[in-house]
Amino acid sequence: MNTRDEASSAAGQEPRPPEPDSSESMRARVVRWLPPLAIMVGILGLWEAYVRIFNVQKWLLPAPSVIIETRVVDAGLLSRHTVTTVEEVIVGFAMALAAGVILASVIALSTTIERAIYPFVIASQTIPIIVIAPLLLIWIGYGLAPKFIVVALIAFFPIVVNTVDGLKSVDPDSVRLMRTLGANRRQIFMKLQLPTSLPFLFSGAKIAVAVSVIGAVIGEWVGSSQGLGYLMIRSKPQFLTERVFAAIFVLSLMGITLFALVGLVERLSIPWWHNERRNQALRHDS
């Protein structure tokens, strides 16, 4: 067995089990998505009924049907601002991902480095991002750059914390085995620690990409002339509440879509981990 095979075995990777039947897989997807869809339809139905029965004014609480109508009528306006927000989220998330993985790798090198750096990482999250955003506008000016930084600041923390935990979760016996096989520190990191930490990294990335949407909106609230956050701020004084809700709907859809995309990359990158989880679930159900 070569070093790569030993590393894969040490990292807990097993031969890929046979895929489930396609009809069973489709049934499983339907069963998984049916409850949330039913709850969403129920909430929207109750919301619509409440507004209609009690004749609630549109500027106070628009009905879902009015929000959908606004989404259609203002499709061009919403799409234009959505493009800006998506750009801010993707670039800021990419910055957070790169910085988070590098910082986590440095922190995981030794306990001394962890004790020196980790307190500052935690302290960075105690400062409200709404306070930092105006300072970035003063230092950098208007434009997309401050929004990128705001998104990165709000998204990098879960990536760092989860990746550090993943890098430190390696079995010491596996490390000793690789050293016995002649692997150096770099080989141990690339072939053992990094593969082992990927499930943790993707867990942090899914959280990070969801909160990245919040970071983009906060940046647009503080100072911007484009984006869904700016559109919401501009619509509020005009009592265009239905447009605010339409923007919220688009933001929610954006967050869910990005979360699902990261999950898809996760399944393609570490199929062995998902197979192991699936087998554990099957054993638990049986």
What does each model-found stretch correspond to?
Residues 16-26, 52-97:
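Periplasmic/extracellular loop-to-transmembrane helix junction in inner-membrane transport proteins
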Residues 20-51:
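N-terminal signal-anchor/first transmembrane alpha helix
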Residues 49-52, 105, 112-119, 162, ...:
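Membrane-spanning helices that line or support transport/gating and their immediate boundary helices
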Residues 92-121, 138:
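Transmembrane-helix boundary motif in ABC transporter permease subunits
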Residues 111, 168, 199, 246-286:
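C-terminal transmembrane helix and the adjacent membrane-cytosol boundary/short C-terminal tail
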Residues 122-158, 165-166:
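Generic hydrophobic transmembrane alpha-helix motif, especially the helices
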Residues 149-153, 185-219, 251:
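Transmembrane alpha-helices
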Residues 167-173, 177-197, 226, 237:
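Short helix-to-coil transition segments within interhelical loops
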